[in-house]
Every structure is written in C-alpha cells, then in structure tokens.
Amino acid sequence: MNSSTSAGVYANGNDNKKFKGDRPPCSPSRVLHLRKIPCDVTEAEVISLGLPFGKVTNLLMLKGKSQAFLEMASEEAAVTMINYYTPVTPHLRSQPVYIQYSNHRELKTDNLPNQARAQAALQAVSAVQSGNLSLPGATANEGTLLPGQSPVLRIIIENLFYPVTLEVLHQIFSKFGTVLKIITFTKNNQFQALLQYADPVNAQYAKMALDGQNIYNACCTLRIDFSKLTSLNVKYNNDKSRDFTRLDLPTGDGQPSLEPPMAAAFGAPGIMSSPYAGAAGFAPAIAFPQAAGLSVPAVPGALGPLTLTSSAVSGRMAIPGASGMPGNSVLLVTNLNPDFITPHGLFILFGVYGDVHRVKIMFNKKENALVQMADASQAQLAMNHLSGQRLYGKVLRATLSKHQAVQLPREGQEDQGLTKDFSNSPLHRFKKPGSKNFQNIFPPSATLHLSNIPPSVTMDDLKNLFTEAGCSVKAFKFFQKDRKMALIQLGSVEEAIQALIELHNHDLGENHHLRVSFSKSTI
C-alpha cells in the first residue's frame, strides 16, 4: 500500500505530515482528519462527533498516533461538521480534539487489520439511522428516523429570560444542516417557532442534540418536537418569518406569518406575532454579555458549548449613549396612578423580571417614573412583560429611557422620598448566577405562585391574607409534594399584580417571608 494515491487513505497517518503550515488548507472532502484523540477513546465516541451532521460511512482509528479518519456520507455533511467545529472545539473525554478536511476523497479500509470494532460501531449506528435500533437512552422518537418523518420541527422556548430571535434560531439550527424556512409566533404565552430543514435527517439530529438544552445560562430552554406539517409556506420575509430560498418575498409588515390552513393545522390563532414585535426600541437580535452559550451534550462527548457568534447579532447592539435603544438599562414608566404608586412598589413589580437598582418617581409629574435595571436585557424583559398591563386602574406604559442612569438627589435637594436606591437590596431575585428564579419568569397572570410558606400557615390563613389586601380569591391549592408552595388564583391579572406588590416578602412568622411570583399554571 502506498499513501500517495489521492483516492484513498491508509493507516500510515500521512495527513499528519501536512499540518506543518507548508501548504494551504485542504479543499472540502467528505473524509475528515482528527488529531489528538485520547488513546483510550472508543470507536463509538469518535463516530459520535459526526453523528449530528449526517451519516458516518467509515472510520479508521490510528490509536498509536492519536489520530482518526472519519468518512461522512456526503461532502455537505462534512462541511456542516467543519463549520460547526471551527469556532467550537469538540472534546472527547474532556480532551480537545482537532478536525480538518483530509486531502483524501474516501476511506479504503477493506484489507486493513483491527477494523472489526470500527465496522461493528458503524453497523450499530447504521441500524439506528435506518430505524431498526434505538440509541441507548433515546426514545423511539429521538433515536430512529421514522418513515415519512417530517423535516419540520416545532420549537418552544421555555423560561424566556432573554429575547430569542429568528436570526438566533437560524444560527443554532444551521449547525445541523440547511435551514430552508422559519416561522416564529406566540401561542399560550410561549414563544414558538416552526423550522424546516432540507432533509428530515437534519431535523432528526437537531432534535437529538438540542432538545432540552438552554440557549443562555439557566434560561431559554429549547423544547423540540417533529411537526405534523411536512413543509412551510412562508409569504413574507421579516423578523417573524423567513424563507431562505426566496429572498424576493415582501416584508408584509403587519400581516400574519401563517396562512389560515397552516395555522389551523398547527392549532394556532390566525394572527401570529413575535412577542417582541413592535416593542419600543427592540432590535431583531441582541447579543447579551451574560450569554455563556448553548451546551449540547446530547451526543456523548461530541458537542461542546455553542456560543452564539457575533455574525448573528452584528450591528444589533445599541451605541453607548444612544437614546431609546437596546443597550440602555433605564426604563421610562408612564401613566401610573400617583395616588397608589411608590418607589418600593415599582421595585417589587419590576423586580420580577430583573434586579432593580434605582427608582425615581418624577417630582413634578408623579404619574411618570424612571426604573433602572441591572442591565439592558433585564430592562427589555421587564418592558416586554409589563407595558400594557393595568395597575391601580391605569394602563402602565414602559419604554426605554434616554437616560443612562437614575441620578440620586443631591444633599439638601427636595425629593419627598421619591428616589430610592435598591442596588444592595436583599430582595433581588437574580443576584445569584444560575438561580432557579431564571427558570420561573412568566408574564403577569391571575394565578400567583407562593413559596416559603411555614408549616403552621393554613390555606385559610393565606386566603384571608389576600382577601384583606382587597383581592377576590377564586381558587387555592397547595403543592401536593411540597406544602411550602401553593397557587392562588385571583379575580384578574390586575388584582394579581397589585397583590404581588403588596404581599411579596410579607412576614408570615417563624422567620418566613412570603415569596410571590406569577405562575404559568392555572388551578
């Protein structure tokens, strides 16, 4: 055997000699060269690196050289894999692995010794891909490609602490194949999307790798299923829908993204909109400094953290100092009821969606206030959830302020206690990184989630507490497995908002202070 032939690659590891920087990178090939693989790694683990991107057709392990060659079924699959792993170094057994195109076009391993284990691993993977065998730990839905399976995925984003846009979804899901179309909408107070791949296999691998993963740390969880639809009909290219094969489509501002038959097939209302469409000052995609990236461990050892690169969000952050644009953490809150609103009340309410640092009610116009959040993303989240809600008989409006910070009054300046600094408050819900509170952020609703209830406090005690606060209690339920928590349903969303302001951190005795938040559930 000699390794000079360009048609195949043999067991001498010839590609390794080409890493000296004395030649340009190889052109795309379906054969990939892996270096620095751990000496005790298994064939299945190496195959798992390629599995999310398409069918793996051959494998050659050179354990003595800590190298391997992986052959994909198509050049397109290999290109997708390289594109994914270029910014994100894969790891096997906690050790970084380096991948590049081989200068060979295919693997020829028929007559080589010690190939039995590699072939057995390939056969096992082939059985999974053909639907005859499930992956260990995977359900039939995940591990097998069923006949006629749809290339369309239905995606639900839970715990939407930061805005997730069409561009962000495209960047994440493009790692697993060619994305043809995306439609985003809101249903049941949840941000959802339909995403169509060119091939059902791509949809299969994306679901396997991404279902249950977080886009950002401890929030924005992906829930992925196959759609009953087999294709999407996109009429407009805008921030809600996109057909990447038809760049000529109109923007269709204000038009529904789905045609009625498609909406009916999905069980969705006729008019669907992004939860952020029309929000004042909201740009289609924002890069958040807190975003540590999407972790994708579904294929053992294969995928490291996926950090959203600047390509999907370039030009979307506001210029520092620009007024009324994302990047500002100060909100202007208007149309408040001056007879009832206080800085503390605004601190408690806006604190549901982020850590409030300062609040200023305007001295000469007390129906207006400034609320400074910990960062721009929290300000955006609070604005999206609270603007338009009724509070003390008036419809609250929140927009991004032209101010970059709330100034404290100078010594001797008349203020009447209208400006408060809460930056060191013990009531901040999100001061701990990765706090579970990130996972329980929901829009205002008539049902409140109560927690930190001491054992001596009864259902009647809590119902009376809310009744005395002026609420009409419609239903109450302790959690079956944990009586420290309960749900209480009030007469309206406005009642619930006002009850949260008044009763969050209420002293229940026994060194227990009531914790109140909005619930996604009903009783």
Swiss-Prot record:
Q: Where is this region: Disordered?
A: 1-25, 406-426
Q: How does it assemble?
A: Interacts with THBS4 (via the acidic amphipathic C-terminus).
- Which protein, by its recorded name, is this? Polypyrimidine tract-binding protein 3
* GO biological process terms held by the UniProt record: erythrocyte maturation; mRNA processing; negative regulation of mRNA splicing, via spliceosome; RNA splicing
N6-acetyllysine modification sites? K394
Residues modified to Phosphothreonine: T109
The RRM domain is annotated at 30-114, 153-229, 329-403, 446-521
The encoding gene is: Ptbp3
